Amino acid sequence: MNFQTISINLTEGKILVFETGKIARQANGAVLVRSGETCVFASACAVDLDDKVDFLPLRVDYQEKFSSTGKTLGGFIKREGRPSEKEILVSRLIDRSLRPSFPYRLMQDVQVLSYVWSYDGQVLPDPLAICAASAALAISDIPQSNIVAGVRIGCIDNQWVINPTKTELASSTLDLVLAGTENAILMIEGHCDFFTEEQVLDAIEFGHKHIVTICKRLQLWQEEVGKSKNLSAVYPLPAEVLTAVKECAQDKFTELFNIKDKKVHAATAHEIEENILEKLQREDDDLFSSFNIKAACKTLKSDTMRALIRDREIRADGRSLTTVRPITIETSYLPRTHGSCLFTRGETQTLAVCTLGSEAMAQRYEDLNGEGLSKFYLQYFFPPFSVGEVGRIGSPGRREIGHGKLAEKALSHALPDSATFPYTIRIESNITESNGSSSMASVCGGCLALMDAGVPISSPIAGIAMGLILDDQGAIILSDISGLEDHLGDMDFKIAGSGKGITAFQMDIKVEGITPAIMKKALSQAKQGCNDILNIMNEALSAPKADLSQYAPRIETMQIKPTKIASVIGPGGKQIRQIIEETGVQIDVNDLGVVSISASSASAINKAKEIIEGLVGEVEVGKTYRGRVTSVVAFGAFVEVLPGKEGLCHISECSRQRIENISDVVKEGDIIDVKLLSINEKGQLKLSHKATLE
């Protein structure tokens, strides 16, 4: 293929340039996207599977090259290795945007790789990566039902901003990443500062207009330079297999949905499937293979659940369409933690724990924008026992990182600022049972743990996951979906917020056709569900506790001049280590001169503050100081009034009586009171002990 390029103008100064035919020409598809001086590359490759599977083995990896900003990784290892949390989150954004666009039962191993090769510090690469990956698939021979595009939306001074720059995003009250096709929304991820449902919908509609622009142009580009799609690896479910399974077990699948218990339901479903396989599976028959029969069972199970919901408005666990599962709450569940809550909603449960600490406890990270730290972070743990399984224990998976970050963003908008509450806050959400909506349980449990710890949040935050049944007869919205409804339904739309508005949201779908009208209904129904949950939370804990836990450290901050930071730290950190050893406190100093002092007792903090004030204090004429005599000479004594600041107390100012020998009055090492009389043009201090005796 020869070099090909197109430009798409989103708005003034924000242009996307797509290039192909120059780099990675052996890949099925490869595209470089430029915007400003940020360049993101994506490739798409696929190979046929040796064994058929009932899922799409799509692998998406996104990597930010430090060379893109003219940097090299710190430390001994200079090569990019294990993906960072941010890279994992962007990989998930790309994956969730693309996955719905692949045809059902595509038997190919598909890999999409995306690299940031140039970053100008302003044009953010996330939406470019979605567009680059979609364009690479579009011009490849890998089957794809529709072209996808992604954009980011910000809100500055109540005005929507398309693909905001890093500077613009810093002042935005909304951070929304949106992906979709020309006709539908496929993926949503964002957080905002207590937006109304109408504001969220307006932002989505604004973003989708730009998605349509990109998709239409990419469609023309695909027709110009794209390869013919290879459909040989798509295996539709044979109608005769589905018919045979229906005749064999329709009644049994209907009876299955009378079972409410998750484990009993799963065991019964497995037994039904095994009986069907025994009856219908034929050796050396590709049509009635185990692969096709199991797929038909899943389809029939889904169809049965949908029919029951549509015809009877009754769900698998017996709830109505809008009912939230029963909730129980126990705060202060763990006695020695700073704050804790056991939150149970149906068969989903989290033990949330809040830990308070100094800045030393903050989460440090390094990315293309440099080094940074987070003073609030939520970590989500999903052990295998939560679903009654045996599995690996180790570093967190992509799902755990994604769920934790969503809950973290939801709660972050209710937190006090550092000046009001100078603590680093860590929440861990330990999922101990799971049957759907564990990330939203983490929001509820995490909020209650914050309140139990005495963190003065602005308002309680709750979360709920909404589901969807979509067919030719219309759309049905489900509140607080279970794991089964997530698995067999068409949408997982998570919304978190308070009575003031929405703080975070995330949507994944399995079908196209999510319209603004459906989203409006889902948001309205979610608001009612969140309010119901907030009322229950309010009964358990109506406000943050007035006092911190007795086991939490005490933290106070003080402001010093940035020019005085060196005085506190000392050469090689000698001075600050001395203060820590002497008082037993923990001290953190930032570049702005904010000193954070933490300790288990107020007396230790006060002692450290006194030392620091002495180190950075400025002497004042007319003020009395208690100082140490550093040396004695014939004409007087030199007295240190503040660390590193000493002045001369002349022999005539040492006593109210005339003295011949100053050693008769003071000796080196004595502690005496002196008054600062004046400071000459050279900065020398004139002191008087006599003035303190009057």
Curated annotation (Swiss-Prot):
Cellular component, GO, one term: cytosol
Cellular localization per UniProt: Cytoplasm
Pfam families per the UniProt record, alphabetical: KH_1 (PF00013), PNPase (PF03726), RNase_PH (PF01138), RNase_PH_C (PF03725), S1 (PF00575)
Top-level taxonomic group: Bacteria
Keyword RNA-binding among UniProt keywords: yes
Boundaries of every S1 motif domain copy: 622-690
Keyword terms, alphabetized: Cytoplasm, Magnesium, Metal-binding, Nucleotidyltransferase, RNA-binding, Transferase
Cofactor: Mg(2+)
Function: Involved in mRNA degradation. Catalyzes the phosphorolysis of single-stranded polyribonucleotides processively in the 3'- to 5'-direction.
Family: Belongs to the polyribonucleotide nucleotidyltransferase family.
Protein name in the entry: Polyribonucleotide nucleotidyltransferase
Organism: Chlamydia pneumoniae (Chlamydophila pneumoniae)
Lineage start: Bacteria, Pseudomonadati, Chlamydiota, Chlamydiia, Chlamydiales
